[in-house]
Amino acid sequence: MVTIRLARGGAKKRPFYNIVVTDSRNARDGRFIERVGFFNPLAKGQEETLRLDLDRVDHWVGNGASTTDRVAKLIKDARKAAA
């Protein structure tokens, strides 16, 4: 099953997440099909917190990909910011 989820990066105590499309059987930070954005929960000042390619997300969801709860909330926030 294809899923859209967060893959953790960054340093210890400084998380940075890539939003990736992957097979659900792959490791959290392992192989992925496509990177569709990123999420930086510790962004300060003018730094970008969230960037998401909504066209590609719509493409994958339209083709049957599921999203995790957190990614679904991030997609909702990105749509609200884009409007």
From Swiss-Prot:
Family: Belongs to the bacterial ribosomal protein bS16 family.
GO cellular component, one term: cytoplasm
Name of this chain's protein: Small ribosomal subunit protein bS16
Gene3D superfamilies to which the protein is assigned, alphabetical: 3.30.1320.10
Statement: the UniProt record of this protein carries the keyword Disulfide bond: no
GO annotation terms (biological process): translation
Origin organism lineage: Bacteria, Pseudomonadati, Pseudomonadota, Gammaproteobacteria, Alteromonadales
Record-linked SUPFAM superfamilies: Ribosomal protein S16 (SSF54565)
GO molecular function, one term: structural constituent of ribosome
Acyltransferase listed as a keyword: no
Alphabetized HAMAP family for the sequence: Ribosomal_bS16 (MF_00385)
